[in-house]
Amino acid sequence: RSRIRTSISAIAIAVAIIAVVFARGLISGMIDSTFENHINYKAGHIRVIDKEYKLKERLFSLNYVLDGFNGEGTSIMIEKLKQVEGVKQVVPRLKFGAVVSMEDELVGMMGWGVDPAEEIAFTRIDEKIIEGRMVELGSREIVMGTGLLEKIDRVVGDKVTILYTTPFGSFKGSTFQIVGKVQSAIQMLDDTIFYLPLDQAQRILEMPGEVTELLLITSNQYKAASILPGLNALFSQEDKTGKYILQVWNKDYELIGLFEIVTKIYNFVYIFIILLACFVLVNTLIMIVNERTREIGMMSALGLSSREILYLFTMEGAIIGVIGSAIGTVLGGILTKVFSVVGIDYTAAMEGMSGG
């Protein structure tokens, strides 16, 4: 019976360790993936925007944009930002709302005017293009997400006329050739986003030298805040209007702050699971001791002290714990590795949520 209870204790500990290792791997992976997408498609490591744009970003406002320090253009601004210690890359983007007219409906979408070279270096978007290629500066061409192409019934090689509104209120249309199809890990982006060369976006929107945001990239995302003093010094010297603000990826976004709180909560859950497994082990040892009172009496008669007898039972519990932990760690690691390669399909769970 002691062997059965010992085995049950080892199995309980192993199961607890497997649960902790797998859950921690799964949740950490999901959070890291969320952080990566947030950085790539939203915030960079530090984002430079107009302070008014922050309030009207959801409206795709083009009235509060970056036009450089004191209106000198973003090209000079980018060069000055690159000179700040710690800034490895500056990624410009010009985001705007647009529509494509179908027979009986208007399909809404969002255009991203980008520098192809900078975008490839930052987000590796070329690896996500499953057909065709990335856009090139100076060319009237676009890359669309897989879902968006299906919505407008187009394929790579077709031309499409996109309707949009300029900052001056003019409603215009421009025709582009579709040169690539992109499929990212975020279905909502694939259903709504198209990329075009930054110079073409600035031309059609009548916004020469202007962008909606600049993403600053550092060598370590978790140390991005350390370069703020240098950036603040530059902006205090160059930005006389004081209209620009700096947003750090993990400090100025409420959602990311919530994820950090969730991580701490899960750490307490992991500890609680381990404590439950320890309780099973302690309970088993108590039952073993109660069943072996005669054996304990014989050990006392042979001259073993109470401390030595306690030591023997403690070592027995430690061995059970080590064996269970080792088995759980190995199996949990294997399980986590398998799912990290195979992945988990959330399509059914997320069905109907992508349109938000």
How would you name each of these model-derived features?
Residues 4-30, 260-295, 318-330:
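Hydrophobic alpha-helical transmembrane segments of multi-pass inner-membrane transport and secretion
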Residues 24-110, 133, 138:
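Hydrophobic, regular-secondary-structure patches
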Residues 133, 147, 154-239:
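Basic-flanked hydrophobic alpha-helices used for secretion and membrane insertion
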Residues 155, 305-306:
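Short coil/turn motifs that cap or connect alpha-helices
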Residues 76-177, 203-205:
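Short acidic/glycine-enriched loop/turn elements at secondary-structure junctions
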Residues 327-356:
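Short helix-loop junctions at transmembrane helix boundaries
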Residues 220-279, 288-290, 299, 312:
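Peri-transmembrane interface segments
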